[in-house]
Amino acid sequence: MDRKALESVAKHYPYLHLQGLYAIPAGLSWFLVGLSNLQRQPVKPLVLGAGALVGLGVFGVVALYYRNHFGSPTPTRSRQVRQYVALALGFAVFVGVDQLARTLLGRPPGQPVSSYAASWAVGMLVFYAIVGGLRTYHVVIWGSLFVAGVLPIWGLSVDRDAVASFPIGVATMASGIFDHYFLVRAFQSSKRQSLEHTNAGA
């Protein structure tokens, strides 16, 4: 299938937001956020810089992979709008839930829970629900993070939010890998249907 035909299929394909391998550098970014915010055992800037370079390198490899396998399509305007709305509402829910929890539990929360992790999980569920629909693995992964966030296992350390960045990073990468798997399977099916339609009209 040539590049133009590939991009024609991808342009109208509804799951391009599931280019989940981008979640690998995103997850690495969460690790860097956590490391950079540790107060009791701060990480040296050199380590953070090296981590950032690794993340950029991985991002470049992922971008090259998707360009070679899916082309460089421009999503339809309606799909772009939906993605922007999903991002905005997901982030707004994260901030709102986190601030509500801190208002009720104190700043920082007086209970050994992580409102940060739990709120981010809720925001991601909202994002996926809007942008393309929740799938079982979304509910399992982000639901598990939410449950972990509300369990009294976090202690009362000043590094609580920084530590929460690590499971958020793991959940991000896990969700992304499943997204990618779903994307590849469904896109191949869409591509076959497009080829069959083209051959039938020839």
Where are these predicted regions, by residue range?
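Hydrophobic core segments of alpha-helical transmembrane domains in multi-pass membrane proteins
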Residues: 47-56, 112-123, 164-176
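Selected alpha-helical membrane-embedding segments in polytopic membrane proteins
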Residues: 24-105
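Juxtamembrane membrane-water interface segments of multi-pass membrane proteins
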Residues: 8-11, 62-74, 186-198
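Membrane-proximal helix-loop-helix units in multi-pass membrane proteins
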Residues: 83-149
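Long, highly hydrophobic alpha-helical transmembrane signal-anchor segments
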Residues: 13, 24-39, 136-150
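Terminal transmembrane helical module of multi-pass membrane proteins
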Residues: 128-202
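Membrane-interface helix-loop-helix junctions at boundaries between adjacent transmembrane segments
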Residues: 9-19, 41-49, 133-144
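N-terminal juxtamembrane cytosolic/stromal segments of multi-pass membrane proteins
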Residues: 1-21, 197-201
